[in-house]
Amino acid sequence: MPREDRATWKSNYFMKIIQLLDDYPKCFVVGADNVGSKQMQQIRMSLRGKAVVLMGKNTMMRKAIRGHLENNPALEKLLPHIRGNVGFVFTKEDLTEIRDMLLANKVPAAARAGAIAPCDVTVPAQNTGLGPEKTSFFQALGITTKISRGTIEILSDVQLIKTGDKVGASEATLLNMLNISPFSFGLVIQQVFDNGSIYNPEVLDITEETLHKRFLEGVRNVASVCLQIGYPTIASVPHSIVNGYKRVLAVAVETDYTFPLAEKVKAFLADPSAFVAAAPVVVETAAPAAAAAPAKEAPKEESEESDEDMGFGLFD
């Protein structure tokens, strides 16, 4: 089959991306740095039937989207995020499920000199199995070691690389010698496009419990502010009523003014012992009962002693 010319290929690509944008209401803008062709093929296979992965040149993707803005103006929100090595993952399924599938397709990778670290790298305390001739190599990296049974032992965990730092040649060599693959590469979700709205992928981690907690925090903040400035709202009115009742009660206690609910408080302040008089009665009644038990056991002890005195032993 003859290979299609470049003009035909571009035309088909534009038609494909426009059709995907029309057919799928949701998509991820994903970064594809350090993702090889074999890994990309595995990702496509794992998403088959649930999502479609589309990669391409940024200029072509922008051109296709700009040409389709008349039919779907909301697509303009995607344009600022098409930069770097990015692509799209289109889906009609639950976004969290597709996100988890992308994360599951990350593969471990060794550290390479010159690469930017996507995460912190810590070398754990361990016996490296390396000979003493490598001691100077560890010292150059500031790693405390000792010789144990003819091999180098790292005494404590060491943070070797920080997120965003460039991996040096020495760090990469050490990690390779220790057979540590600190990084994992795959499609990284940069933005989420959902029915015309675009937002950060961290929003996918928000649960109903999180929303409920944040809502209650907001209600408490509103109530606090409204109470301070004296502005009544649904959130602050219950607190205002309680505070008002406390003030009226305080006035009633200090004056001759009274009302049914205040009378009980006044009675308590006048004679607090009247409200706790029943408590000692329980203790007092319980004490004689406890004392009566030994009294009943006393005759039994006397009878046992008398049996022994009479000589009725066990072997008689």
From Swiss-Prot:
CDD domains on file: Ribosomal_P0_L10e
Post-translational modification comment from the UniProt entry: Phosphorylated.
Keyword Ribonucleoprotein included in the entry's annotation: yes
The entry's keywords: Cytoplasm, Nucleus, Phosphoprotein, Ribonucleoprotein, Ribosomal protein
A GO term from the CC aspect: nucleus
One GO-annotated biological process of the protein: cytoplasmic translation
Top-rank taxon, per record: Eukaryota
InterPro entries to which the protein is assigned, alphabetical: Ribosomal_protein_uL10, Ribosomal_uL10, Ribosomal_uL10-like_insert, Ribosomal_uL10-like_insert_sf, Ribosomal_uL10-like_sf, uL10_eukaryotes
One Pfam family, short name: Ribosomal_60s
UniProt-listed PANTHER family: 60S ACIDIC RIBOSOMAL PROTEIN P0, LARGE RIBOSOMAL SUBUNIT PROTEIN UL10
Self-association state and partner proteins as the record states: P0 forms a pentameric complex by interaction with dimers of P1 and P2.
Identification of the protein by name: Large ribosomal subunit protein uL10
Protein source organism: Gallus gallus
Lineage of origin: Eukaryota, Metazoa, Chordata, Craniata, Vertebrata
